[in-house]
């Protein structure tokens, strides 16, 4: 990667922009998209669904959507719902978490034309479903309802057959205002559990068995709600590689793995390339670190230079120049962060240092634009700022 960062540093210094930038390596992104495309070519049991919060830029979403031939999206933040509906004529949106009922009512009151949009609202309890039912009655609309199920993550959602039957019965009783659209079971725990507690393969099979149990309830006890186009959503980037091999789901949500921030470094995703980087310019170069109140340390031998960079303290790890790291005692800063590099490092003011984000969803909203870097040229893509 050293050659990549050296070239990127030179190209950034020749560009007009000297602010901190969030860089997408276009070549690496293309490789990741090719990997996903190939997997879906053979995983004919699944349809891809893009997680908007993880790819929170309209141009990025359009690029990925076109490459994967999908207009299925998962939205976690309501202000991002309308832009998706407006920019994708065939948008199929599944909410990734239950929304407060006031937001649902506000959305349809402010955007009545969206009544005809393909939106699946996620419901986790009978109480929430009753709230949604009341809104649908007041507005004289029909809401598509997707039920959140607990497949082992234990973050809420239906966790018993009795609860599932209760929700399905309520939907069945109000066909004018509620339409059952499917299930959503997020299984991120599968790859996070220490092997000593449960192996990945075992945890995945257990989560799949739980999912199938709820599907069976629908098909066997509520046949009038069952049809071929129900959305059985699962996954997330961590378990992508498992679902494409075998899954009881027919709809797979993912996003982060395409950019591969460091939280998604795993054995199952090892073939994917990291392609999201923060580039920030060096403001000051000092021969060594000086600590306030400890001038006596200045007389000691120093093996590191001290740099002060533009910004800092992102959810990201410094990766270049080699050996770069925050100072242990000086403290972190979001304004001008001090970092150390080996004394032999050739670096000057206005050079860039590089960091690798741990998440994409936490970092993208902090930058007004994404900088798409391909063939030594840059494109600016607007990001979703909230």
Predicted features and spans:
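Active-site-proximal beta-alpha core segment in soluble small-molecule metabolic enzymes
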Residues: 48-193
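A non-catalytic, amphipathic alpha-helix used as a structural packing/dimerization or gating element
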Residues: 24-35, 206-213, 353
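C-terminal accessory subdomain/extension
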Residues: 286-386
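Conserved, mostly hydrophobic/aromatic
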Residues: 29, 53, 84, 147, ...
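Active-site loop/helix belt of alpha/beta enzymes
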Residues: 144, 150-270
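Generic N-terminal amphipathic, Lys/Arg-enriched alpha-helix
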Residues: 4-24
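Active-site loop ensemble at the mouth of alpha/beta enzyme cores that anchors a bound cofactor
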Residues: 202, 238-309, 313-315, 319-323
């Amino acid at each position: 990667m050293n050659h990549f960062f050296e070239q990127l540093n030179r190209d950034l210094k020749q560009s007009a922009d000297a602010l901190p930038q969030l860089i997408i390596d276009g070549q690496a992104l293309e490789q990741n998209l090719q990997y996903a495309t190939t997997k879906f070519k053979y995983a004919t049991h699944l349809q891809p669904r893009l997680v908007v919060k993880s790819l929170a830029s309209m141009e990025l979403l359009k690029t990925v959507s076109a490459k994967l031939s999908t207009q299925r999206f998962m939205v976690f933040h309501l202000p991002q719902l309308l832009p998706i509906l407006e920019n994708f004529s065939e948008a199929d949106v599944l909410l990734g978490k239950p929304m407060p009922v006031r937001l649902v009512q506000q959305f349809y009151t402010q955007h009545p034309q969206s009544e005809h949009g393909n939106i699946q609202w996620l419901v986790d309890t009978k109480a929430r479903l009753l709230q949604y039912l009341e809104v649908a009655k007041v507005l004289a609309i029909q809401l598509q309802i997707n039920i959140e199920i607990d497949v082992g993550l234990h973050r809420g959602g239906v966790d018993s057959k009795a609860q599932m039957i209760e929700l399905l019965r309520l939907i069945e009783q109000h066909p004018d205002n509620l339409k059952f659209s499917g299930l959503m079971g997020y299984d991120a725990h599968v790859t996070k559990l220490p092997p000593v507690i449960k192996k990945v393969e075992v945890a995945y099979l257990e989560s799949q068995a739980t999912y199938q149990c709820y599907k069976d309830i629908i098909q066997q006890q509520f046949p009038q709600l069952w049809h071929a186009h129900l959305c059985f959503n699962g996954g997330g980037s961590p378990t992508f590689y498992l679902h494409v091999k075998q899954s009881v789901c027919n709809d797979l949500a993912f996003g982060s793995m395409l950019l591969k921030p460091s939280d998604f470094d795993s054995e199952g995703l090892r073939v994917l390339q990291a392609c999201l980087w923060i580039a920030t310019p060096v403001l000051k170069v000092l021969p060594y670190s000086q600590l306030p109140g400890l001038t006596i340390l200045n007389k000691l031998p120093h093996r590191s230079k001290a740099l002060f960079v533009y910004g800092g303290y992102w959810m990201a790890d410094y990766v270049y120049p080699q050996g770069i790291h925050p100072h242990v005692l000086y403290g972190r800063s979001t304004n001008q962060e001090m970092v150390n590099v080996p004394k032999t490092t050739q670096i000057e003011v206005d050079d860039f240092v590089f960091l690798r984000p741990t998440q994409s969803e936490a970092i993208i909203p902090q930058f007004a634009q994404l900088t798409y870097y391909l063939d030594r040229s840059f494109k600016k893509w607007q990001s979703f700022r909230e």
